[in-house]
Amino acid sequence: MALSASSRRGFCRVTLAAGMLVGALLPLRTVLAQPGPVKAPLTLVEVNRMNEAAFVAAFGDTYELSPWVAKVAYAKRPFPTVTALHQALADAFGAVRREQQQAFFRRLSDIGDRTVKAENITAASKLEQSVSGVDSLTEADHERLKKLNKAYRDKFDMSFTIANRRNTQDTIFTQFERRLSNDLATELAIAIQEEFFITRLRVAEQVLGEGMPRVYGDLTAHVLNTVVGQPANGMAIDLFELSGDTGRKVAQTTTNIDGRADIMVGRPLPNGRYELRLAMADYFRKQGAALGSPPFFDVVTIRLYLDNPEGSIHVPVACSPWSYAMYR
């Protein structure tokens, strides 16, 4: 059964996979990524008090290894909001000639490049690739990525740029292949926009203050036990990121006393396909329900497509040992 579900500020396509799940639906890899800033964030007040040298030291790598961007943005101080700080950096990059922008993207290391030297990539970039999983691909996928990187450089003489933390592995590959058909002007414009997303997230995790940009989304669930007409407290929920015929666990949680669960919060919701797995049989077994052997429903799966990394997606489920449904 295919359903469409809208949320407060997001959109997802949901497919309910009904019936009993025997074993794992897909080959699995478990990677519970914990993105976030490495150092304690600065305050906007501290940023506005910096001299030029301190400002460039703090933001010289926001646009990867390009302190000139920070030097230009420094002239816009004081920044009334964190959003204004990021916009000043983006405006500094956007104001230079197209040739200089291309040179910036040309110097970037290729996505997933295992041979890149430490001085040619920032810690932030390494973290972003780690969270998306492109630094730990299978050998087959790594070879596929190497070929795409070469084809992209051969055509555009630039490194392929995408906001890793806003996209799943599957979406990164899809976008890579799709964007190879673009012309240079289109591709440069897309690369600049993706760099905007990358740097906005970096600034938001580096500085706290007034007017924070929205860079995180949230995926939540609410499960009701229709047998007793109460919230389902203690149901295990796993979230898998789908790529081809494999699944990668990216979150795990348990519903609270109100039947609610924060599945993916405090980070962008990467564009891509997902599968929620609700351990329904285990939950009702603990409630003392008489279940068949095997139970009618074991693990219930709900498939989603997320396409708003900063959106709010809520998945409400009503269930019994013999039925389940989405509700609004």
Q: What is the meaning of each model-derived region?
A:
Residues 2-19, 26:
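N-terminal secretory signal peptides and thylakoid transit peptides that target proteins
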